[in-house]
Amino acid sequence: MSGHSKFANIKHKKEKNDATKGKIFTRLGREIAVAVKEGGPDPNNNNKLKDIVAKAKANNMPNDTIDRSIKKAAGEGNAVNYEFVTYEGYGPSGTAIIVEALTDNKNRTAANVRNAFTKGNGSVGTQGCVSYMFDQKGQIIIDKEECDMASDDLMMLALDAGASDFNEEDDSFEVLTEPDDFSVVRETLEKAGVPMMQAEVTMIPQTWVELSDETDLKNINRTLDLLDEDDDVQQVYHNWDE
């Protein structure tokens, strides 16, 4: 298949900088709340919710915590209304950064995101200023040690289900799909007993930017760390070749 998409670098993974599982669960809880509001509380009738529940389980979120999040979101009175917002901007040496957030206060979130860019000598741009540099894809990462299926069999299973690409690294496999095909491919792998480290729709850079200047490296890490610390921020994508 085609060359790999550097999936180890696709996004600045918030999980690695989170001090506790609680922060991860809080972010997943917000995603659940939005999915329930948009499509109802039954995962069998709400593919977006079904995908998020699978993502939550992959992050070891307990079933009772998932159930409570769904029930809370389904209740009219106590549910917080979160709005999905996206910010695009530039880091050092023209690196492209996309920030996805779920917030109940857009003014607060916008100010925090702008501050994170400014502190790293970057800037927030207009909508569309960098998103054209990325492709939206469904992405599934599978740990080789956890997977009993042979590489060729796994590839054929994924491609037959509708995957657009299959890549193999030293310790993992990557399955890529078009966004509309993601749910079907994920469910097919799940039913076949394939363990998934990560399964979500993501943004994959078309090209990568290398940074060697110490000041640039310090600045981009500062921006990404500040975004990590913001509870409103759900995902951060960039094209820095870490």
UniProtKB/Swiss-Prot annotation:
InterPro entries: Integrase-like_N, TACO1_YebC-like_2nd/3rd_dom, TACO1_YebC_N, Transcrip_reg_TACO1-like, Transcrip_reg_TACO1-like_dom3, YebC-like. GO terms for biological process: regulation of DNA-templated transcription. Keywords: Cytoplasm, DNA-binding, Transcription, Transcription regulation. The keyword Repeat does not apply. It is found in: Cytoplasm. GO terms for molecular function: DNA binding. SUPFAM superfamilies: YebC-like (SSF75625). GO terms for cellular component: cytosol. PANTHER family: TRANSCRIPTIONAL REGULATORY PROTEIN YEBC-RELATED, TRANSLATIONAL ACTIVATOR OF CYTOCHROME C OXIDASE 1. HAMAP family: Transcrip_reg_TACO1 (MF_00693). Belongs to the TACO1 family. This is Probable transcriptional regulatory protein Cphy_2507. It comes from Lachnoclostridium phytofermentans (strain ATCC 700394 / DSM 18823 / ISDg) (Clostridium phytofermentans).
